[in-house]
Amino acid sequence: MDMFSLDMIISDPAAEASRAGKKQLRGVQNPCPSARARPRHKSLNIKDKISEWEGKKEVPTPAPSRRADGQEDYLPSSTVERRSSDGVRTQVTEAKNGMRPGTESTEKERNKGAVNVGGQDPEPGQDLSQPEREVDPSWGRGREPRLGKLRFQNDPLSVLKQVKKLEQALKDGSAGLDPQLPGTCYSPHCPPDKAEAGSTLPENLGGGSGSEVSQRVHPSDLEGREPTPELVEDRKGSCRRPWDRSLENVYRGSEGSPTKPFINPLPKPRRTFKHAGEGDKDGKPGIGFRKEKRNLPPLPSLPPPPLPSSPPPSSVNRRLWTGRQKSSADHRKSYEFEDLLQSSSESSRVDWYAQTKLGLTRTLSEENVYEDILDPPMKENPYEDIELHGRCLGKKCVLNFPASPTSSIPDTLTKQSLSKPAFFRQNSERRNFKLLDTRKLSRDGTGSPSKISPPSTPSSPDDIFFNLGDPQNGRKKRKIPKLVLRINAIYEVRRGKKRVKRLSQSMESNSGKVTDENSESDSDTEEKLKAHSQRLVNVKSRLKQAPRYPSLARELIEYQERQLFEYFVVVSLHKKQAGAAYVPELTQQFPLKLERSFKFMREAEDQLKAIPQFCFPDAKDWVPVQQFTSETFSFVLTGEDGSRRFGYCRRLLPGGKGKRLPEVYCIVSRLGCFSLFSRILDEVEKRRGISPALVQPLMRSVMEAPFPALGKTILVKNFLPGSGTEVIELCRPLDSRLEHVDFESLFSSLSVRHLVCVFASLLLERRVIFIADKLSILSKCCHAMVALIYPFAWQHTYIPVLPPAMVDIVCSPTPFLIGLLSSSLPLLRELPLEEVLVVDLVNSRFLRQMDDEDSILPRKLQVALEHILEQRNELACEQDEGPLDGRHGPESSPLNEVVSEAFVRFFVEIVGHYSLFLTSGEREERTLQREAFRKAVSSKSLRHFLEVFMETQMFRGFIQERELRRQDAKGLFEVRAQEYLETLPSGEHSGVNKFLKGLGNKMKFLHKK
């Protein structure tokens, strides 16, 4: 039988001993032996001959064998064994003689096949029950004769004798090894596993010797080393029966062998060390492959070993990968790590942490190389105690992490990580890594705990917040318009730097006298002190006489949920008698009935009677005209409780032919928003031109509309004949303080000095009367003066246009701001007036005054304000950026912005530090510490002004509103005040107090010594 081809049968010096003694038996089994095996017969030494003759003495009884033709033939079992042994030994000799190049791992893999060939013996109990007895760390040629002799022994006595010798040799060679319990390779599952694998393989491959095919044919060799059909058929017929029979004997021998209890299995650490180094360096598995793969399908269906470009499968033990390398544990760990990182670098999109979890879930080395690198993602900041070595330059931050996990992994991953910006690399690595222990870092010399601790604050430029009290940071955070910067610079130049002390500093200096370089000691004359005391007395006396009205802003908040307007009226001129003057009368009213209580109805009726007088204060001067350009104006009605209602009027000429008298459409509302109601009046005028009957449906739709919030827009639908249903957009701006305000008319009517005097009189809530010959100029100037006192509100009587019939109101002892036409001036002179400022807008002069208006305001602040107002036109020309904050309406102009910002800065200088002295009480109510607030100002003249100004109703309303307002609600004044506070030095004392505190600190220091 051609069991092996000629090129595979190569003599081996170790096998010569067995061949010399078994010539006859070999001739029976293989009548045509290889010619290349005979010349080596003479090179036998004494040891080999003794082994050969020992084997001849124990020739077992022949075992029946079935031939290819179906007949049984009794062949010695040693013949089958020798045939298989010769085949295997000739292959080993090929590698050793160099006739076919190979590696040491190839030789060891084939020796593994020689061990399993013994499974064909009728009684190979020692061979299959101990399948790895030949596997020894001291594997070499000296062991081969002993192993060959063990294969030939079939007699029980001889086997027992050899087993005892083997036990003695093992005791001598492995005395220092720690005994371990038998592993899975010693359990009874091993022979069935080999039997199953060996019996399945011939069926899949088409037959052949089970010993050779099961060991020689590896998944990596199937392509190049597949047996030919003739050889397969020959092997199928000759070897199937002995294979099955040998398996039965294997199980009987392994169970009932009397020598098994005396066999001490080899220690497991040595076997692990052995098969860890016996794999092929080409990537072929070693001896441990079959042991560790029991749960896998048969060998032909096994997938090839995973390539480095993919993560290793979880079912393959990590020893398969380490078998290629040396037995050193350190080298083994590093190469596994490198292979894994190479796979992650080639597939960079795969998470490195996930790959390590897949491939290295069972690490059997002495120390875990990943324990200081890998960790599940942490919720807290892993960089909390690490210092950044990089510096932030502008918007680019360069961060150096000497302790970065990338420093402990191969270059493939390090270069890939370093290709990204440092900041993004930090954010991406923090999900998968925790930093190395600082003790290990200091041991390696890459860093020390004192140098690796970063701030816990984010390093992104977008996450940087500017602290209060840093002027540069404050200006970086909020873009301040150039106009505001110019105005602030003028104030600083004219009056010097003003220092405001904090709350604690003001409390310390309450009992002391505060003076500094800004104190105006030269102005502290007896006359000025006397005038100051007189003003203080007058303000307090008027405050007792006048009712305390709520502030206008809080009143608007109270009525936000009410209707958009209260009523709409149409006023016309009629003659009661021929030759008499025209009298204004109500011709139309909506709604017809006022749904209010009796008190409000009585007040509303009084107002309805007075509205025609405000719509036509110059009724006696009118005559019928043929053409008239419509005009818009407004007036204000003040109730008994101080509530204020605005009247928005549109005077126009009704439709018709010939000469006609004009009529006025008036909307009365609590909301002070001129642009919104001007839009409604435009729609009224358009529908009035079509038919007067269309006005009432429009006003009904507007009244039913919701009240708009600040900056919001409401939609009103109304039917218009010829156009269908129209949608009217009504927008309420964020800041309506400059609407319907024309500062140009005010400056054209008054000089800067007169304007500042009127402004000072209003701040002390004095009585002021404007005189003008035109209704439009009178109305505009009154509205402009009220707008100048923002963020304060005029709390008293305010009548921009007073009808001549109501001129006696000017005799009231309460503060007021009233506008009169020049035609009412003779009547005014006949009335007994008390402390009132009468301003002639036509001639820009004061008709009556109190002679102290020029000394009310702090001197330096007044000079700075006047300087800005003198340069208003130049500043307005430079202002080409549009509205500063996007809050102003379409009527806003650069001049309006310049004037408004100048007066806002004035109030910031006076009361901009109020927020520092608002403290919360037990019920979370904020209250102003008035005395500390006043004494926080260093300038004496400013403290004197605050002493009087804080007694006014407008200041109390201002503070009351801020105490009740939410802290997050900020208007233009709050924004400018915050900018001002950011420019102040924090905690700086002035004058003597600063010196005394420094002296006290020195005394404490000396006392400690």
From Swiss-Prot:
Residues 737-870 form the cDENN domain. It comes from the Eukaryota. The keyword Nucleotide-binding does not apply. Gene3D superfamilies: 3.30.450.200, 3.40.50.11500. GO terms for cellular component: actin cytoskeleton; cytosol. The modification Phosphoserine is found at S551. The keyword Signal does not apply. Residues 297-314 have a biased composition (Pro residues). Keywords: Cytoplasm, Cytoskeleton, Guanine-nucleotide releasing factor, Phosphoprotein, Protein transport, Transport. It is found in: Cytoplasm, Cytoskeleton. GO terms for biological process: protein transport; retrograde transport, endosome to Golgi. Residues 503-513 have a biased composition (Polar residues). Residues 872-969 form the dDENN domain. It holds the Pfam family dDENN. Residues 45-59, 130-147, 218-247, 275-284, 434-443 have a biased composition (Basic and acidic residues). Its main location: cytoplasm. Residues 15-153, 171-334, 434-479, 498-532 are annotated as: Disordered. Residues 566-715 form the uDENN domain. Disulfide bonds: none annotated. GO terms for molecular function: guanyl-nucleotide exchange factor activity. Guanine nucleotide exchange factor (GEF) which may activate RAB9A and RAB9B. Promotes the exchange of GDP to GTP, converting inactive GDP-bound Rab proteins into their active GTP-bound form. May play a role in late endosomes back to trans-Golgi network/TGN transport. PANTHER family: DENN DOMAIN-CONTAINING PROTEIN 2 (PTHR15288), DENN DOMAIN-CONTAINING PROTEIN 2A (PTHR15288:SF3). This is DENN domain-containing protein 2A.
